[in-house]
């Protein structure tokens, strides 16, 4: 399945400034791009280039200073207005994968995966069934009752991926998801994310500095000094 032309994320002249007056620092500078359903996009750039700031704005964690941000065709921020309940929006439409997995240590795998769906008022039986299906799909179906401390690094990341899919998101935002993994495991996780975009029809935006992963993405967006310097569509 090829990426569609259905817009999931659209940013228009998005900027972020920290501080005021002489101490103001502009971390993101008038960035514009669009991400579509079923598309895998890499956000590349050196440390301090603005990648994390950009992804936290897209994830409705950090509020932009200027510009417009659309999610699934809905305007959720401009400099004069923003959607009131960003937490609910995150729970319903965005999945997150972090470098450190961020699994809750005192909850087992099933409880970690079903937490957000249950917050969204999903039927508990349906949430558990979805968790089982995702774990089977990701090759860790026997870990449903395991505690995070009992998982290997690769297993933890697969559970984190399952958790990101549990609320049927429109987009998954992944911040350096393979940084803690060795080369072979990192490649395996990235191939899995590519497969998910196609088979689950979800957009995936990955912050990474690993140039070896570039061939796996549909598009490469490069950021440097707060600017989008390149937006390249790759040949499939």
Where are these regions (language model features)?
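Conserved switch/coupling elements of ABC/ABC-like ATPase nucleotide-binding domains
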Residues: 75, 225-233
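ABC-family P-loop ATPase nucleotide-binding domain
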Residues: 1-17, 230-236
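ABC family nucleotide-binding domain
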Residues: 8-9, 14-223
